[in-house]
Amino acid sequence: MTAVRAARVVVVGAGVVGLLTALECALAGHRVTVLDRGTIPDPGSSSYDQHRAIRTLVPGDPEGTRRMVAAHRRWRELETVLGTAFYRRVGVVTAWPPDRVAAVVASAAEAGVEVTRLDPAGLPHLGFPAGATGVRETRAGVLLARRVLRAAARWLAAHPAVVLRPHCAVTAVDPRSGRVELAGGEVLSADLVLVAAGPWGRELVGRPVVLHRQTMLYLRPPDRLARWWRTAPAAGGLGADGRAWAVPPGGGTLLKISSDAVCREVAAADCADEDQAPWAERLALAGVLPDVGRYTVVAARACHYTTDAETGGAQLARLGPAVWARAACGGTGFASAPLVAGRIVDAVTEVAA
């Protein structure tokens, strides 16, 4: 067997994809430098949220389901690696029209994913579309996103083969040579570079992507519902139009609601001058929570993510012999991050062989 040498890896962007890729590369014996324009982790990054839902079933897509099962498994393993509990297995419920439920359940059975049907009346504090039926995936739940990023950054900071370089803006990446140019004129070289800078990396990548901005609301349930919410599942397909999500509080987080109905295409990730109030009001009235007036609104936040301009989904692209890019994360970028990290480790291994 040929020994694999320790390769030099540069990761541009310290969001969840960047940090997990750095971690996996270090575990594989490679030397890693992580660059970010802000702090590590950066509270302004797209990944830096209180929580994100994770589920494995992709109805009608056996390969997609298989991949998410693998991602779910790796997330559980990472709790041990990082020495931090960040996964709440509370389940994920999705609302479906009655005529689609049988196909969803059959798809789950074929993939070996455990699901149960439920009557929305059993979850009275979630706003299901009229006539919808719930399907609950039991081996699913919530990732405490902020806790993940902090734990990964601590682990990387303590690893002898990893260098974290916050406040290092990258101005150019050569896809053929792997040369990375920093704002101050410094140039780094690597055997492999991953650009995972989210919306702020579009100029470095040069791939056609669409930038989206979505307003999210963080709420505190009324005292009389606090106990109910402590064991509530994450839920999707909510609201009158079936386009909303609710992620339950727990582990120091608030209740979060979001909806595609308040997602819009934008030209830049800077939203300091945008008034979130109209979007937040529209979200509050979307029917995600039947008795929303009883909840206390703690904060509204705008989140940005990119999608492939052609497919509308995620995109992991090889830009050249030495450079890969997570050009678009799609709507499930956090949950699927271990898959990207694993693919990059495979690419580094090929380079180092």
Where are the regions a protein language model picked out?
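Glycine-rich phosphate/pyrophosphate-binding beta-alpha loops
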Residues: 323-337
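N-terminal Rossmann-like FAD-binding beta1-loop-alpha1 element of flavoenzymes
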Residues: 8-34
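Short hydrophobic core segments
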Residues: 10-12, 35, 187-200, 341
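Flavin (FAD/FMN) cofactor-binding and adjacent substrate-gating region
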Residues: 95-166, 172-174, 307-309
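Active-site substrate-recognition segment that forms the wall
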Residues: 23-27, 85-87, 199-321
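Dinucleotide-binding Rossmann-like beta1-alpha1 core, especially the glycine-rich loop
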Residues: 50-126, 131, 243-244
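Conserved beta-strand-loop-beta-strand element in the redox core of flavoprotein oxidoreductases
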Residues: 171-187
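Glycine-rich FAD pyrophosphate-binding loop
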Residues: 27-47
